[in-house]
Amino acid sequence: MNESRKTPLVLVILLICIFLPTFAAVPFPQQDSTLVIKDVLIQTSAAYLWLSPVIHVATVVLLIALYRYRSKIGRVADAFFGILFLFFAFSNHIAVTENYGLTVITSNLVPISIVGLFWMWEVYRPHNEYTFERLPAWRYWVLPFVFLAFWSPINASLSPDFNPLLLLTSSFGVMYCPTTPLIIAILTLIYPKVNMLVLRTTSLVGLVIGLFNTMSFFIMPGYTLWNLILHTPLIFISAYGLLIPILVKKNIPPETLHKEK
């Protein structure tokens, strides 16, 4: 199957997966799905925070190494991101809760797993070229949003917490939503020298999950405006990742564009 047909098919499959139902050992009415998801995320958001400093430091080291050594360590970066997505898929979306027993948020677990597998395939057949050439100034708009996601200044009650220590201990690196913006942003900064299937699948899943979080502000008890604001990096950068082929073609010479891979 050629690329022009394969990519839309993959995106449609991902969209279908995002609407899979949540499963729990204790049956529940579908109208309570948001409460079930809330129970899972409350538990999983704290379960692996002990790993956060390690992943924060590893990410910074990787970014410095990418800037210095570029595509020489491209496969290391691809593997790191792929492992993170597979980790998020299972660690963030499976929990044994007090109210519902073993619970699986399949609508997130399946598509994020697929994204992770695409990243692992990128390790095997790499197409991302981490060259970081000089870009027009407007293309760096993602950086403040990446910093916000990396910091994730929020406390357990979902209120603002601008403690600088969170630059080392926030949920970045152990939760999907604050970590994905950085990964997509990196791809946009090396575009067009990217694996387009990886960029599109990662961006689509990020955008849909980000938009579902927007809906949670209206239907999930305890979901705060600040938590919604902290999901704007995921929404904006994911949307940009999908639209960048349209936006950038108008701003760079056509001969510099790579074909889809």
Predicted feature locations:
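N-terminal topogenic module of multi-pass integral membrane proteins
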Residues: 1-101
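Alpha-helical transmembrane segments of multi-pass integral membrane proteins
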Residues: 10-22, 79-91, 107-125, 134-159, ...
